[in-house]
Protein backbone atom coordinates (compact mmCIF):
# COMPACT_ATOMS: atom_id res chain seq x y z
CA UNK A 1 0.00 0.00 0.00
CA UNK A 2 3.07 2.25 -0.23
CA UNK A 3 3.05 3.25 3.44
CA UNK A 4 5.78 5.60 4.61
CA UNK A 5 6.58 3.19 7.47
CA UNK A 6 7.63 0.62 4.86
CA UNK A 7 10.00 3.12 3.30
CA UNK A 8 11.46 4.10 6.67
CA UNK A 9 11.71 0.66 8.29
CA UNK A 10 11.75 -2.16 5.73
CA UNK A 11 13.29 -0.54 2.67
CA UNK A 12 16.74 0.12 4.23
CA UNK A 13 17.02 -3.55 5.29
CA UNK A 14 15.76 -4.98 1.99
CA UNK A 15 18.09 -2.67 0.08
CA UNK A 16 21.10 -3.60 2.22
CA UNK A 17 20.39 -7.33 1.88
CA UNK A 18 19.50 -6.95 -1.82
CA UNK A 19 16.17 -8.74 -1.36
CA UNK A 20 13.77 -8.22 -4.29
CA UNK A 21 10.10 -7.57 -3.57
CA UNK A 22 6.84 -6.25 -4.98
CA UNK A 23 5.11 -3.17 -3.60
CA UNK A 24 1.51 -2.56 -4.60
CA UNK A 25 0.82 1.16 -5.02
CA UNK A 26 -2.59 2.75 -4.64
CA UNK A 27 -2.27 6.30 -5.89
CA UNK A 28 -4.92 8.62 -4.39
CA UNK A 29 -3.26 9.06 -0.99
CA UNK A 30 0.13 9.66 -2.59
CA UNK A 31 -1.38 12.35 -4.82
CA UNK A 32 -2.97 13.93 -1.73
CA UNK A 33 0.38 13.97 0.14
CA UNK A 34 -1.07 11.86 2.95
CA UNK A 35 1.52 11.85 5.76
CA UNK A 36 1.34 8.05 6.19
CA UNK A 37 2.16 7.33 2.54
CA UNK A 38 5.36 7.52 0.53
CA UNK A 39 5.88 10.28 -1.99
CA UNK A 40 6.20 9.70 -5.72
CA UNK A 41 9.91 10.53 -5.41
CA UNK A 42 10.33 7.74 -2.86
CA UNK A 43 8.45 5.31 -5.09
CA UNK A 44 10.64 6.30 -8.03
CA UNK A 45 13.69 5.61 -5.84
CA UNK A 46 12.36 2.10 -5.18
CA UNK A 47 11.63 1.58 -8.88
CA UNK A 48 15.10 2.74 -9.91
CA UNK A 49 16.85 0.45 -7.40
CA UNK A 50 16.39 -2.62 -9.57
CA UNK A 51 15.15 -4.60 -6.55
CA UNK A 52 11.55 -3.50 -6.62
CA UNK A 53 8.64 -4.41 -8.83
CA UNK A 54 5.81 -1.87 -8.68
CA UNK A 55 2.36 -3.42 -8.78
CA UNK A 56 -1.01 -1.81 -9.33
CA UNK A 57 -3.38 -1.52 -6.41
CA UNK A 58 -6.13 0.88 -7.56
CA UNK A 59 -6.56 4.60 -7.13
CA UNK A 60 -8.86 4.74 -4.10
CA UNK A 61 -8.15 1.45 -2.29
CA UNK A 62 -11.89 1.04 -1.76
CA UNK A 63 -13.74 -2.26 -1.39
CA UNK A 64 -14.31 -3.11 -5.04
CA UNK A 65 -16.70 -5.85 -3.97
CA UNK A 66 -19.13 -3.10 -2.90
CA UNK A 67 -18.74 -0.99 -6.05
CA UNK A 68 -20.45 -1.05 -9.43
CA UNK A 69 -18.23 -2.29 -12.25
CA UNK A 70 -18.19 1.09 -14.03
CA UNK A 71 -16.89 2.67 -10.79
CA UNK A 72 -14.19 0.01 -10.50
CA UNK A 73 -13.20 0.60 -14.11
CA UNK A 74 -12.91 4.38 -13.56
CA UNK A 75 -10.90 3.82 -10.38
CA UNK A 76 -8.36 1.59 -12.12
CA UNK A 77 -8.18 3.98 -15.09
CA UNK A 78 -7.36 6.85 -12.68
CA UNK A 79 -4.54 4.80 -11.17
CA UNK A 80 -3.20 4.07 -14.67
CA UNK A 81 -3.12 7.80 -15.42
CA UNK A 82 -1.13 8.35 -12.22
CA UNK A 83 1.31 5.51 -12.97
CA UNK A 84 1.96 6.88 -16.47
CA UNK A 85 2.42 10.43 -15.24
CA UNK A 86 4.62 9.61 -12.25
CA UNK A 87 6.40 6.37 -13.19
CA UNK A 88 6.15 6.40 -17.00
CA UNK A 89 4.62 2.91 -17.13
CA UNK A 90 1.55 0.94 -16.10
CA UNK A 91 2.30 -2.02 -13.82
CA UNK A 92 1.53 -5.49 -15.17
CA UNK A 93 1.01 -6.98 -11.69
CA UNK A 94 -2.01 -6.13 -9.57
CA UNK A 95 -3.25 -6.88 -6.04
CA UNK A 96 -6.95 -6.89 -5.19
CA UNK A 97 -7.76 -4.24 -2.60
CA UNK A 98 -8.14 -5.94 0.78
CA UNK A 99 -7.55 -9.17 -1.13
CA UNK A 100 -11.27 -9.42 -1.77
CA UNK A 101 -12.67 -10.30 -5.15
CA UNK A 102 -15.16 -12.36 -7.09
CA UNK A 103 -14.98 -14.24 -10.36
CA UNK A 104 -16.78 -11.38 -12.14
CA UNK A 105 -14.44 -8.80 -10.64
CA UNK A 106 -11.39 -10.84 -11.66
CA UNK A 107 -12.72 -10.97 -15.23
CA UNK A 108 -13.15 -7.19 -15.23
CA UNK A 109 -9.67 -6.50 -13.86
CA UNK A 110 -8.08 -8.96 -16.33
CA UNK A 111 -9.28 -6.65 -19.13
CA UNK A 112 -6.64 -4.13 -17.99
CA UNK A 113 -3.91 -6.49 -19.26
CA UNK A 114 -2.47 -7.44 -15.89
CA UNK A 115 -0.33 -10.56 -16.31
CA UNK A 116 -0.72 -11.69 -12.71
CA UNK A 117 -3.19 -10.68 -10.00
CA UNK A 118 -2.77 -11.33 -6.28
CA UNK A 119 -5.26 -11.77 -3.46
CA UNK A 120 -4.26 -11.30 0.15
CA UNK A 121 -4.72 -14.85 1.34
CA UNK A 122 -1.48 -16.18 2.76
CA UNK A 123 0.14 -19.03 0.94
CA UNK A 124 2.91 -20.29 -1.27
CA UNK A 125 2.29 -20.20 -5.00
CA UNK A 126 1.94 -23.62 -6.59
CA UNK A 127 1.50 -24.78 -10.19
CA UNK A 128 -2.22 -25.33 -9.62
CA UNK A 129 -2.92 -21.70 -8.63
CA UNK A 130 -5.13 -19.32 -10.59
CA UNK A 131 -2.71 -16.63 -11.85
CA UNK A 132 -5.46 -14.06 -11.39
CA UNK A 133 -5.87 -14.83 -7.68
CA UNK A 134 -2.44 -15.80 -6.37
CA UNK A 135 -1.69 -15.98 -2.66
CA UNK A 136 0.87 -13.67 -1.12
CA UNK A 137 2.33 -13.08 2.29
CA UNK A 138 1.74 -9.55 3.52
CA UNK A 139 4.43 -8.09 5.71
CA UNK A 140 3.42 -5.22 7.97
CA UNK A 141 3.56 -4.13 11.61
CA UNK A 142 1.20 -6.97 12.61
CA UNK A 143 2.52 -9.70 10.34
CA UNK A 144 6.12 -8.80 9.70
CA UNK A 145 8.03 -10.08 12.72
CA UNK A 146 11.32 -11.92 12.00
CA UNK A 147 10.01 -15.28 13.28
CA UNK A 148 7.02 -15.16 10.90
CA UNK A 149 9.24 -14.04 8.03
CA UNK A 150 11.55 -17.03 8.59
CA UNK A 151 8.52 -19.35 8.58
CA UNK A 152 7.35 -17.81 5.32
CA UNK A 153 10.73 -18.46 3.73
CA UNK A 154 10.52 -22.12 4.78
CA UNK A 155 6.95 -22.60 3.53
CA UNK A 156 6.23 -24.99 0.67
CA UNK A 157 3.20 -25.19 -1.58
CA UNK A 158 0.97 -28.23 -1.72
CA UNK A 159 0.65 -29.89 -5.07
CA UNK A 160 -3.15 -30.01 -5.21
CA UNK A 161 -5.00 -32.29 -7.57
CA UNK A 162 -8.30 -30.50 -6.91
CA UNK A 163 -10.09 -28.32 -4.39
CA UNK A 164 -13.60 -27.19 -3.51
CA UNK A 165 -15.29 -24.78 -3.34
CA UNK A 166 -14.21 -22.98 -6.50
CA UNK A 167 -16.15 -19.92 -5.34
CA UNK A 168 -13.85 -17.15 -4.16
CA UNK A 169 -16.40 -14.92 -2.46
CA UNK A 170 -18.37 -16.28 0.48
CA UNK A 171 -21.85 -14.98 1.27
CA UNK A 172 -24.87 -16.07 3.31
CA UNK A 173 -25.71 -18.85 0.85
CA UNK A 174 -22.29 -20.54 0.97
CA UNK A 175 -20.92 -19.68 4.41
CA UNK A 176 -19.93 -21.69 6.30
CA UNK A 177 -18.48 -23.76 3.55
CA UNK A 178 -16.90 -27.18 3.42
CA UNK A 179 -13.32 -27.26 2.23
CA UNK A 180 -12.26 -30.31 0.23
CA UNK A 181 -8.67 -30.83 -0.89
CA UNK A 182 -7.24 -33.67 -2.97
CA UNK A 183 -3.46 -34.03 -3.11
CA UNK A 184 -1.29 -35.81 -5.66
CA UNK A 185 0.66 -37.46 -2.85
CA UNK A 186 -0.14 -38.66 0.67
CA UNK A 187 0.19 -35.67 3.03
CA UNK A 188 0.40 -35.95 6.82
CA UNK A 189 0.34 -33.31 9.53
CA UNK A 190 -1.28 -30.41 7.67
CA UNK A 191 -1.89 -27.01 9.27
CA UNK A 192 -4.49 -24.70 7.75
CA UNK A 193 -4.25 -20.97 8.33
Residue spans for each PLM region:
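Terminal accessory/targeting
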Residues: 4-41, 50, 111, 127-128, ...
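Glycine-centered structural positions embedded in regular secondary structure
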Residues: 55, 117, 181-183
Amino acid sequence: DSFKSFYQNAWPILKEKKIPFIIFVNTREINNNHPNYMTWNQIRELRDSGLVTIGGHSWSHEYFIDMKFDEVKKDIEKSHQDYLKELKFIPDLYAHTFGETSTDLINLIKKFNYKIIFGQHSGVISQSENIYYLPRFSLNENYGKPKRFKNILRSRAFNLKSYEPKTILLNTSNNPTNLKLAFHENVKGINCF
